[in-house]
């Protein structure tokens, strides 16, 4: 899954570089505030793609003495930085540009250039969104989109999905702003569109920050995975029950499991050791993402006289 996420990030970043260039050229030629905001948006998305790739690379490093559980949470940290970047740079600068245009409106020049650039941008963003959506769809496990995002453990993937969705919405708003400004000679519409684009970025950033924060502070594994792990433990003939089943997501594809397993009263030590080994082996075979397994043994003493 990590390789697919990286491919989606690379596709989005490459597209954003090309889009940013043509948007800024169009903004310079036409004086469009909305197009300038879209250029800022694409530059921010390009930088964010680089940050996500940096996070994926650092998160893939093996465990060491200082980080015995690995570096998988690096991805969560850099996703939070991306959210702050979208909020502060993307949303803030777009709104500033729009408000400045509202205070000092100016008529559009060469609006046809804007239409051509917006059409090209839609093509590039749609291709990027298609790659991200296909990757996301394979990981959603039949859940509704919003639920799949909430339960998702790979922020690099849903970050790109957020960015591409916000980009397509922003392009639509920019088109409406340019069209109204052009047809009705209303330059204020162009500035208003820039403010709306900024608000879209702020909302996307806040949502992304919320999801990244939850993962960064230590989120449990997917409920379906937890239930499946419980089934594996209970399926062993020596196990009579379970105590606490604690999980934590250590990275997009890494899970820590701490499980209390209850055995038959008076079970011999050798039988318990074999059962623990079987459970660990079955978990490793079925769920390779569960990289850290800690089994706590609970054996009530045998009843007196037995």
Predicted regions and their residues:
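Alpha-helical transmembrane cores and adjacent cytosolic helix/loop segments
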Residues: 1-223
